[in-house]
Amino acid sequence: MAILINEKTRVLVQGITGRTGAFGTRAMLEYGTKVVAGVTPGRRGESVWGIPVFNTVKEAIEEVGPIDLSVTFVPAPQVKDAVIEALEAGIKNVVVPAERVPLHDILVMVSKAKAMNARIIGPGSLGLISPGKASAGWIGGARELIEESFRPGKRRSHL
């Protein structure tokens, strides 16, 4: 059962044009994740792995439609602004892989997420995976390795 991410989850990548953002996006795409847009200020009109890049989260949503989850591949000092931008645009799930995010920034993000009935996974999170369906964040690598490490569970009729 996929709870936070599945094959239909529409994912946005903040920081998609950076080295880590492009690498993480490629891993997610190879696993089957439905990455529909990326955001890097000042880079509108570009594309990464065929994914359109926009200047803001709001602009991306206006162009591609609703987004279910954002992954913030941005440096720790930029995490707070990226997360708040995603939350204010209406995204309810935000994955934050960055480490060393200042504690005050974390408190601000958590308070904002609670007020907006949203969820932050991280900071310092490897991300999410629904085996055989989709992944978000750093849970990536060679598809064969992921499939060996993360397998769908067996359905039990008594549950």
Which residues fall in each region the model found?
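General beta-strand structural signal in soluble alpha/beta enzymes
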Residues: 13, 37-40, 96, 119-130
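N-terminal Rossmann NAD(P)H-binding glycine-rich loop of SDR-like oxidoreductase domains
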Residues: 17
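N-terminal Rossmann-fold NAD(P) dinucleotide-binding loop
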Residues: 21
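NAD(P)-binding Rossmann-fold cofactor-contacting core
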Residues: 26-48, 123
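Rossmann-fold NAD(P) dinucleotide-binding segment
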Residues: 62-69, 73, 77-100
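Rossmann-fold NAD(P)-binding glycine/threonine-rich loop
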Residues: 99-119
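Conserved anion/nucleotide-ligand pocket segment
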Residues: 128-159
